[in-house]
Structures are given as C-alpha cells and as structure tokens.
C-alpha cells in the first residue's frame, strides 16, 4: 500500500495541518508513509480504534504534533505509546530527539519496529515492556504520555525513568485541576499549555510536570 492508496484528501488535510502548526512541509512525506503503514496494519491487528485515515490525520498525527514546540532535543521516553503516538511523529519532526517507544503489547511493538525500519528512523527505538519494568533509572530528559493514566498514575509507573529536573509532558483534555492537586511529593507543575489542534474540536492541554 503506497500513499496513493489513501483517500485523496488525506494528503491535503495533513499539509494544511502542518502549515497551521508552522511545521515544514517536508515532514508530510514521512508522516504519510507512517500513516499508510498504520492503516494497512490496523485492518488486521486492530492497533487503534480510529479507522478513517482522515480522522487519523487529526486525532493521531496533528494531535501528537501539537506538543512538538515544547520538546526540542534530548532523550524522550513515550509511555504507553500504542502504535507510536506521539513518539513516532515527534521523532520524524525532531531528528535531534532520541525517542524510546515504550509499549507492552506485542502486536503494537512489532508494528513500530516495522515502521522504524520502513522510515529508516534512526533516532527511535522500541522497548517492548510495561513502563514500570523498564530498567533505565533517571535515563531520560522527558517523558510523554498521551492517553495513559492520571498524572499520578503516569508518575507511579514511569517516574523512575526521568532524571531530576526532567519534565513529564502529558496530553489532557480539559484542564486537569484535580489531577494537578493530587501530584505526589517531589513533583510540581511548571506550565499548562492550551493546545490548538487543526480540525479537532474540544479542549486540549499539555501539562508540563517537573521532577525535583
């Protein structure tokens, strides 16, 4: 399945979304290759509940890339990444970022390995394990989690991976006031950024939590 097998408006939707997010149009080609592979594998392996490639552009690619301005370089562990979201789009658009894709589901891990090979994406690797089982203490500058758990839950399973002074960047819908109030000792909110995702209705926030 090549890019031409996608509905004809998918490429335009992605191009418009990248422009709205002030991202280079050259990123469209590798992102479309990733999307094409995801659509193909999803028919057999049920990697995501989103089936429509047009929806995947908005709800997967552009939503993932909304956090891109806040992660520039360093090391990143993407916890519960599923089929590689947001980790693979971030690795594509931030080549200076070293990304570890943490996922315990074997089908999703196999898909991601194939995607990294297909894209020749040398700045990302797959850790097929639950986050709490990854034995790399204080190895990462950043953690991301897009739809994994509450803030406290993310910290409970993956906080050991973050170096002191590092940041957890968690994608949330409405402002998570109660989750912020329930942060464990040694963790504090640095910023909460309202996000605008092209084509996506509803509130989105990026919560940046620092490890003291």
Curated annotation (Swiss-Prot):
GO terms for molecular function: rRNA (guanine-N7-)-methyltransferase activity. It is found in: Cytoplasm. It comes from the Bacteria. Keywords: Cytoplasm, Methyltransferase, rRNA processing, S-adenosyl-L-methionine, Transferase. S-adenosyl-L-methionine binds at residues 80, 85, 131-132, 146. It holds the Pfam family GidB. Its EC number is 2.1.1.170. Gene3D superfamilies: Vaccinia Virus protein VP39. It catalyses: guanosine(527) in 16S rRNA + S-adenosyl-L-methionine = N(7)-methylguanosine(527) in 16S rRNA + S-adenosyl-L-homocysteine. GO terms for cellular component: cytosol. InterPro entries: rRNA_ssu_MeTfrase_G, SAM-dependent_MTases_sf. Belongs to the methyltransferase superfamily. RNA methyltransferase RsmG family. Specifically methylates the N7 position of guanine in position 527 of 16S rRNA. PANTHER family: S-ADENOSYL-L-METHIONINE-DEPENDENT METHYLTRANSFERASES SUPERFAMILY PROTEIN (PTHR31760:SF0). NCBIfam families: rsmG_gidB (TIGR00138). HAMAP family: 16SrRNA_methyltr_G (MF_00074). This is Ribosomal RNA small subunit methyltransferase G. It comes from Xanthomonas campestris pv. campestris (strain B100). The gene is rsmG.
């Amino acid at each position: 399945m090549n890019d031409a097998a996608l509905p004809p408006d998918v490429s335009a939707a992605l191009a418009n979304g990248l422009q709205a997010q002030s991202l280079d149009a050259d990123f469209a080609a590798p992102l479309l290759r990733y999307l094409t592979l995801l659509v193909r594998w999803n028919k057999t392996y049920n990697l995501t509940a989103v089936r429509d490639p047009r929806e995947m552009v908005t709800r997967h690619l552009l939503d993932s890339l909304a956090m891109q301005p806040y992660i520039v370089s360093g090391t990143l562990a993407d916890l519960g990444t599923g089929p590689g979201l947001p980790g693979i789009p971030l690795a594509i658009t931030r080549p200076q970022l070293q990304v570890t894709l943490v996922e315990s589901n074997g089908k999703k891990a196999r898909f991601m390995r194939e995607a990294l090979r297909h894209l020749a994406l040398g700045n990302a690797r797959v850790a097929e394990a639950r986050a709490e089982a990854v034995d790399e203490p204080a190895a990462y500058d950043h953690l991301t989690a897009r739809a994994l758990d509450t803030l406290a839950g993310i910290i409970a399973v993956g906080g050991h991976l973050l170096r002191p002074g590092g940041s957890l960047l968690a994608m949330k819908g409405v402002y998570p006031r109660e989750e912020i109030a329930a942060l464990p000792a040694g963790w504090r909110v640095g910023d909460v950024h309202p996000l605008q995702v092209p084509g996506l209705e509803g509130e989105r926030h990026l919560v940046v939590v620092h490890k003291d």
